[in-house]
């Protein structure tokens, strides 16, 4: 009984600075592991000192390559963090949240019923495929800004490690590459849904 409680007790996971994951200044852990569950804190492309990490800062932050560079930085850190928990980002990730910075819609556009953020996430999705082959249940939201200056992307995840097979339901969304639902053992994970016709 005591051994079982040790396995399920929450454990903070720090992959270590040698893994290349910057240590955040905020009072939280990069990951918490409890039983087979792993909860990953949101990752940004930041050095947690100056804002956007200098290694990916570009002259024109509006270029699509900027989002791809941030995606590679963020997903690489997530993969290292998840590996430190004993899980695999592709095999064990069951749910993902993605936050993109956009100045749209404006208040006027929103009042007119237009809530499209006006950004292409294709560079992010292209990079994500290098780390995650599956199309996981997900949520994608646009925000005016993130906590660290000049960052345009934040991603957080849940992983679940057990011996069960992963079963997905429905066809992947053609734009965001996520499935409506995923089942792992007794657990079912759903994508967020909105009143959008993705066939247009």
What residue ranges belong to the model's regions?
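N-terminal presequence-like segments and the immediate start of the first folded domain
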Residues: 1-95, 100-200
């Amino acid at each position: 009984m005591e051994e079982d409680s040790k396995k399920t007790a929450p454990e903070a996971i720090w992959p270590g600075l040698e893994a290349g994951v910057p240590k955040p200044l905020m009072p939280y852990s990069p990951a918490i592991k409890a039983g087979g569950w792993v909860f990953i804190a949101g990752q940004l492309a930041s050095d947690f000192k100056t804002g956007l990490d200098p290694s990916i800062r570009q002259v024109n932050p509006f270029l699509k390559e900027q989002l791809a560079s941030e995606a590679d930085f963020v997903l690489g850190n997530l993969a290292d963090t998840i590996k430190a928990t004993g899980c695999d980002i592709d095999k064990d990730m069951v749910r993902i949240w993605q936050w993109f910075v956009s100045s749209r819609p404006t208040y006027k556009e929103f009042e007119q019923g237009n809530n499209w953020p006006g950004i292409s996430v294709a560079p992010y999705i292209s990079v994500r495929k290098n780390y995650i082959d599956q199309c996981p249940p997900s949520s994608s939201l646009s925000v005016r800004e993130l906590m660290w200056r000049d960052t345009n992307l934040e991603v957080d995840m849940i992983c679940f490690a057990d011996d069960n097979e992963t079963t997905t339901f429905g066809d992947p969304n053609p734009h965001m590459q996520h499935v409506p639902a995923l089942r792992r053992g007794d657990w079912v994970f759903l994508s967020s849904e909105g009143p959008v016709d993705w066939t247009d």
